[in-house]
Regions:
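S-adenosyl-L-methionine
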Residues: 306-341
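Conserved SAM-binding motif I beta-strand of class I
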Residues: 294-299
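C-terminal catalytic and target-recognition region of SAM-dependent MTase-like enzymes
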Residues: 368, 382-444
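Conserved class I S-adenosyl-L-methionine
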Residues: 270-277
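Non-catalytic accessory regions of SAM-dependent methyltransferases
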Residues: 52-169
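Conserved SAM-binding loop of SAM-dependent methyltransferases across substrates and taxa
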Residues: 280-292
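Non-catalytic substrate-recognition/targeting regions of SAM-dependent transferases
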Residues: 157-162, 166-168, 184-254, 262
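Mobile active-site "lid"/loop adjacent to the S-adenosyl-L-methionine
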Residues: 342-372
């Protein structure tokens, strides 16, 4: 009996030891797992601290306009109170208001008058390659929703929250402009995004624009893909147009007027039409396509007139529309003196100024050409006129047309007043996103 009790006792002790040992091993496993989690959290926290430490800050003055708080992405140098030491041109930085509140993240160029351009108002978003790929994908989603698929401005700078970035889509070909240092540094990301989303036939860089020099950048142009023939043909409103991506104005073609060119279809039928500042003849060829009796387009550039004639032949309209090389200001004045008349006058001049110092000259120029245009019209004729000068507001443009009508002793009735096509979206509060004014008036 005594032996049995001892045996039972030893058995219980052995079982207890096994249970205790297993518990210690399980506890050790849990401790090791917890240690691993803690180590990962510490590593992530350490990386976050490094990231935040590296993220330089810009502090704004306490008394500044509400423009930035209301959504404008530009911050001028005279609005800045302090910039952290060690900031380099092109760096991504955080911006804080004078009261300490977070304003946004963007890129900085201390040498520029516009010292910061904001990319996001969300502090949690990291500005990296994927950020821009996602943004461009969102831009494409918007264009598809609004019906701009074949040809469109895929990215319109500030309006698409990527300041100073322009990407135009011409069917399977793309043209990129990066007009500020901070956005130019991300050019490889834009090329990657286009390749991922579209599988394009070609990508071309048109950075041959003087504004880049204000950012310390050189003017340049060239292929961002395998080389291809930069002379392409696009379709617009049932017509075909040659586009020279390498040497054409801006990015090769004025996509912002594509809706406005369609707007003339009812007023040009059976009409004698004169177009000034014709460039490659897009408005004039639309007029011929929509049933005009005769169309004459004039432009000072011989190269533009040559392309316009090619476009007329491309669409089989060379017997209706013709083009001449001439100075529009001189010809309009002479024709009004000669009392030449037509049914429709179309004016699509380039920007007359990019500086507030010369805005009065621009006003005088717009008034002059519209006055002369009105004098060419038969009673009941139509004036089709545009301004792409961003410093001329829609209100000012209408005032100029009213002054021209008064001096021409004509009565006008508004038919259409609109802006650029919707692939160039307008953001309220960011005035430079609305730059194009397009007006049709009946003239008596």
């Amino acid at each position: 009996m005594t032996f049995k009790k001892v045996k039972d006792t030893r058995h219980k002790e052995q079982v207890a030891e096994k249970v205790k040992g297993k518990g210690q091993r399980d506890q050790g496993t849990r401790i090791n797992a917890q240690d691993s989690v803690h180590a990962c959290l510490i590593s992530l926290l350490f990386l976050l601290v490094i990231y935040l430490a590296d993220m330089k800050r810009v502090y704004l003055k306490k008394k500044i306009a509400n423009r930035i708080a209301n959504g404008h992405p530009w911050i001028f140098a005279n609005e800045v109170q302090k910039v952290d030491d060690g900031v380099n041109a092109g760096d991504i930085i955080e911006v804080y208001f004078g009261n300490g509140k977070f304003a946004g993240k963007g890129y900085i160029n201390p040498k520029s008058q516009i010292i910061v351009r904001l990319l996001t108002r969300n502090k949690e978003i990291e500005i990296n390659e994927q950020f821009f790929i996602d943004r461009i994908a969102e831009c494409w989603k918007y264009r598809k929703k609004t019906g701009y698929i074949e040809n469109c401005r895929l990215v319109f700078g500030e309006a698409d929250e990527m300041p100073q970035l322009i990407i135009d889509k011409f069917n399977d070909y793309f043209v990129i402009q990066t007009l500020a240092l901070g956005i130019d540094l991300w050019k490889p990301a834009f090329v990657k995004a286009i390749n991922q989303i579209f599988k394009p036939k070609g990508i071309y860089e048109r950075n041959d624009v003087p504004v880049r020099e204000l950012e310390g950048l050189s003017q340049q142009k060239g292929f961002l893909s395998e080389p291809f023939d930069t002379r392409i043909i696009i379709n617009e409103n049932g017509l075909k147009f040659n586009v020279d991506l390498e040497n054409g104005q801006k990015t090769g073609y004025f996509l912002d007027q594509q809706d406005n060119r369609r707007a003339i279809q009812n007023i040009v039928k059976d009409a004698d039409v004169i177009g000034a500042f014709t460039y490659t003849g897009t408005f004039e060829i639309h007029a011929a396509h929509y049933g005009a009796r005769s169309v004459l387009g004039i432009d000072i550039s011989e190269n533009a007139i040559e392309q316009a004639n090619q476009n007329a032949k491309l669409n089989g309209l060379q017997n209706i529309v013709r083009f001449e090389t001439a100075n529009a200001f001189d010809v309009l004045k002479q024709w009004s003196r000669d009392r030449r008349q037509c049914d429709v006058v179309m004016l699509d001049p380039p920007a007359f100024t990019k500086s507030r110092e010369t805005i009065q000259k621009a006003i005088t120029g717009y008034k002059e050409i519209n006055l002369r245009g009105m004098k060419l019209l038969r009673p009941g004729g139509f004036l089709v006129t545009s301004s792409c000068t961003s410093l001329v507001s829609p209100e000012l443009f209408l005032q100029i047309i009213d002054m021209a009508a008064k001096d021409a002793r004509r009565k006008i009735r508004q038919v259409v007043f609109q802006t650029q096509s919707s692939d160039h979206p307008i953001i309220r509060g960011i005035e430079n996103t609305q730059y194009l004014k397009f007006l049709i008036v009946e003239v008596q």
